[in-house]
Amino acid sequence: MLFFISCSNSDSPVAPVDPVVPQPNRAVNLTHFNNLYKEIDFKGKKAGFIYIYSNYPTYEPVTSIEESGITCVDDVARAIIVLSEYIKVYGSDADSLDKIKKYTEFILAMQNENGYFNNFIYADYSINTTYVTSVANLNWWSLRALVGLETAYPLLKSDADITNRISQSVTKLLSNIKRDLPMTSLTTETVNGIEMPTWLPLKYASDQSALLIIGLLKNYERTSNSGDLTMIDALAKGIMIMQKGDATHYPYNAFMSYNNQWHAYGNDQSNALLKAGVALNKQEYIDSALKEVDNFYPKLVQSGYAEEYFIQANGDNFSEISRKKYAQIAYGIRPMVSAAAEAYRYSKNSSHLILAKNIAAWLSGSNDAGQPMYIHETGICFDGIVNAGQVNKNSGAESTIEALLILLEMEKLK
């Protein structure tokens, strides 16, 4: 089963947005992001989290969600990444570092005794251990915890207590991951005529594999653990098998996300392969990623983007079974911006910079709705384009986070 990553899933109608006080003179406005922040006493520590939902017209956080919860590791870990990128662009500040520490305390407290992470907490701050996307297992939220903790570590290095606990937590998590993904038999199988790797998370999940590569890279930078390199290489090889078509044949070097499905959200394969290829001097990773960036991305942008599609094999080629164009969300745009930016850093080719700018322009109105999705005066990013001309103007954590990451990526390219 493939689980959708997002903690949120709202479909509210179109409505105008009310402004709040902006952060002056900066392209990246953290006002709304910070309005979603909550500090609590959690398992004996001062911890912080970011509310999942924030709805039009007030944009006050939604403080009670019965089925799943009010916040999740998936979003808190990404909030750490936002603040780490913000520090890279604008310099370190005490408030950002304090929030990073408290977000980190939240993630550490969400580690289950089995070594993986539960995802949600309820309004009473009890941990949801049973909801399908909150069970402590090898899935998006545990991988996100890895990336969040490794991102926080160097920023908190002056605090020996918390960095020691991060190290212990990550060691336990990676022990689980390497046990459950042994990488000892890299065999493929044919599913509906399409060659698939069988050793990735959830067997075929190249999207989750990309996130794991990013986390393993950060761990390797910190620990020099050779086991990380073995796993990165196996994951990269699996991802490259999931790349289908070529420059002139559909789907134009796109990486399938899971089995025969491509989806926009969290499809960080090119981003991960470029990061790993540059860091580890693996040209095959870089070449594979550039094929998607150069061949698939421009066609997707020209077509007005998509939410997902499914492919089938026709002899040596592929054709499309079905396609959904909407909803379109910041979490579907950000991976492409990240990859195009990484491509530009590697190649110094202006075409990659132009591509990154063109994709990022989705936020400012170059989209099917014909209107901005990010409102600089408020720091709000709308939750998605529902269909041509219709926008869901709620602004939850995920949309806010992913929009800010797009903006920060573009600031780094200046």
Where do the protein language model's features map onto the residues?
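Solenoidal tandem-repeat scaffolds enriched in leucines and small polar residues
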Residues: 193-285
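Low-complexity, Ser/Thr/Pro/Gly-enriched N-terminal "stalk/linker" regions
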Residues: 9-78, 82, 90-132, 160-199, ...
